[in-house]
Amino acid sequence: MYAVIKTGGKQYKVAEGESIFVEKLDVQAGEEVVFDQVILVANGDDVKVGTPLVEGAKVVASVDKQGKEKKVVTFKYKPKKHSHSKYGHRQPYTKVTVKSIEA
C-alpha cells in the first residue's frame, strides 16, 4: 500500500515504514504528524485518485529528527573590478517515518 501526499509545496510517494525527508515542519522530534493532503492512495489494484484530494484519507508519521542539508555555496564576482560576494545556504528539513496510511 502506498500514497502520494502533499506537504511543503511538494509531492511525495510514501509507503508504510518508509522514511522521507520533507520541508521543515514545526514539530519536535518524537512527536507524531498527520498529513491530510492525500492525492492518491493505492492498495494493490484498488487505486483512489482525489479530485484534488482523497476524502477521509490521512497518513500518520513520526518525526525522527530536524536538521539542515549540506551547505550550498554561491560565488558572484565582477571581472576586472575588485567586487565579489560569497553566499552560503543550508536548507532545513524534517525526517519522518510513515507509521500508517488510512483511506
Curated annotation (Swiss-Prot):
Q: Name one GO cellular component term.
A: cytoplasm
InterPro entries named among the record's database cross-references: bL21-like, bL21-like_sf, Ribosomal_bL21, Ribosomal_bL21_CS
Question: What PROSITE patterns is this protein classified in?
Answer: RIBOSOMAL_L21
Q: Does the keyword RNA-binding apply?
A: yes
**Entry's Gene Ontology molecular function annotations:** rRNA binding; structural constituent of ribosome
A biological process (GO) of this protein is: translation
Keywords in alphabetical order? Ribonucleoprotein, Ribosomal protein, RNA-binding, rRNA-binding
The function of this protein is:
This protein binds to 23S rRNA in the presence of protein L20.
Tell me the subunit arrangement. Answer: Part of the 50S ribosomal subunit. Contacts protein L20.
Which family does the similarity line name? Answer: Belongs to the bacterial ribosomal protein bL21 family.
NCBIfam families in the record? L21 (TIGR00061)
Q: What is this protein called?
A: Large ribosomal subunit protein bL21
- What is the originating organism of this protein? Lactobacillus delbrueckii subsp. bulgaricus (strain ATCC 11842 / DSM 20081 / BCRC 10696 / JCM 1002 / NBRC 13953 / NCIMB 11778 / NCTC 12712 / WDCM 00102 / Lb 14)
Organism placement in taxonomy: Bacteria, Bacillati, Bacillota, Bacilli, Lactobacillales
Name of the coding gene: rplU
